[in-house]
Amino acid sequence: MKYLIVNADDFGLTKGVNKGVVECYKNGILRSTSIMCNMPYAHEALEIKELCPDLGFGIHITLDAGKPLSSPEKVNTLVDERGYFKRGFPHSLDDADVDQIRIEIEEQIKKAFSLGVTITHMDSHHHAQSHPRVIDVFIEMAYKYNLPVRSTPLDREIIIKAGLKTVDNFIYNFYDEGVKKENLLSILGSLKEGITEIMSHPAYVDDELMNISSYNTKREIERTILTDKDVLQFILDNNILLANYSILK
């Protein structure tokens, strides 16, 4: 069987992102999202779960955008003089203290579990989990909280070796220049047996998103493609089963 998890990263970043997640669930092929727990609209998770009962919610561990959930004094190697996460991943974490990384990751996990939705998995913003200072803590926390994880080409080998539950295939090229309907149809046409995740970032683009994210207008295009009737029909015609990470629990 071919199982497909289309996951929307960045839930909670803006209202427009959350609205895009709902749209792609109700009228498209999206069945999973991951929450940026340090962002202002993360709290909408429960409300949106009620609108989208089969939507899975994961944790989008964030170490290079916005402010930490921990007090800046506790994670001073992660933040700048204003108390925001240092920008410029991966080098922004090169001098980060591993114990401070652990503190912040666990704060974000605890926040996710407090939102009132079942947490299906864990992944990370800009694939921060793959950083040498992060990967061991990421694995440790996945074990501690019994969470399946996304595995990327940068960290798949170590995640598999650690014995964590993860997808069989991870597709990351439906992004930026790859945000084209024909590209998504090609990806769907070459799906392998097992469980595949396609990373996505759909949204309704508003001023708030334009001001805080350099990846903006393409999110609107992603949204229209993920709800396209030809894409929906392809899924039906090829017996692809839409899922979220709870399939791995």
From Swiss-Prot:
The enzyme's E.C. designation: 3.5.1.-
GO molecular function: deacetylase activity; hydrolase activity, acting on carbon-nitrogen (but not peptide) bonds, in linear amides; metal ion binding
Disulfide bonds: none
Biological process according to GO: polysaccharide catabolic process
Pfam families: YdjC
Cofactors demanded by this protein: Mg(2+)
Gene3D superfamilies documented for this protein: Glycoside hydrolase/deacetylase
Alphabetical keyword list: Carbohydrate metabolism, Hydrolase, Magnesium, Metal-binding
Entry binding sites for Mg(2+): 60, 125
Known function: Probably catalyzes the deacetylation of acetylated carbohydrates an important step in the degradation of oligosaccharides.
Similarity comment: Belongs to the YdjC deacetylase family.
Subunit composition and interactions: Homodimer.
Annotated protein name in UniProt: Carbohydrate deacetylase
Taxonomic source organism: Thermoanaerobacter sp. (strain X514)
